Amino acid sequence: ALVYECMGSKNQTGPIFYEGFRGEFEQVSAKDNYYNHYIYQAWQHWGMAMGNPLFTGPVYNKDGRIMFANNRINAHHLGISGTPGKEWAYRLLLTYSRNWGTYDNPFDDVKKQFSSLLEVTYSPVKWNGWSFSISGAMDRGNLLGNNSGGMLVIRKTGLIK
């Protein structure tokens, strides 16, 4: 299976538009400030973004503010999965994003982030219901920093005999 997704929120409702005449601006349109609101707290749950993981949630704010400090993003995501044999499966996820902050608090420079995950699963036919997975993930960039991690999973479904 193959999936490609692209997402863009850099131009929220288009360019900034000043509504008015003769130099008097009654309203400024655009700059919607996705996931943030001036009355209620940001669209988040326990500091994490609800709906789109690419929006950097409030949990990442060093000053403790409940707001999204980065909601202007252009991103590309590629996912590939397959089963090359009866007992083997794999999954590869790759995401690249360019981040501009918010309209009110833009980043000085565009922040770039690359994230990846590779997972391989072995499900031996002779051991009904058992599977073993190993996965590794990494982030590289100047938005969230450089991080790496891994996971080993031993899973049994059904009754243990």
Please report, for each region that a protein language model flagged, where it lies by residue.
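Exposed, low-structure sequence patches enriched in small/polar residues
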Residues: A1-K161
